[in-house]
Amino acid sequence: MMQLAVLICLSLVVNTFAQSCVQDSDCGNDDQCCLYSACATKPGEMFVEESGEGALAKVACSVPAPRALGFVGIHL
């Protein structure tokens, strides 16, 4: 019974994270932006960030951030 309660709790937490990831994205409801939210930009894109010592170019990461799954199974 305890395992089921933990599993339900984890599923709710993960689903909440996935929803907030899409909603908090600057790209509206674009799942691709959510997918690469841990990157500076989407793969292949660059942006320039101003700093005290001049502009610093950042390149997007080539591997997407792990997406939240709708269901998480664990074995206790």
Swiss-Prot record:
One of its GO terms (molecular function) is ion channel regulator activity. Residues 1-18 form the signal peptide. It is found in: Secreted. The keyword Signal applies. Its main location: secreted. It comes from the Eukaryota. Expressed by the venom gland. The keyword Nuclease does not apply. Keywords: Disulfide bond, Ion channel impairing toxin, Knottin, Secreted, Signal, Toxin. One of its GO terms (cellular component) is extracellular region. Disulfide bonds join 21-34, 27-39, 33-61. The presence of a 'disulfide through disulfide knot' structurally defines this protein as a knottin. Probable ion channel inhibitor. This is U14-hexatoxin-Hi1a. It comes from Hadronyche infensa.
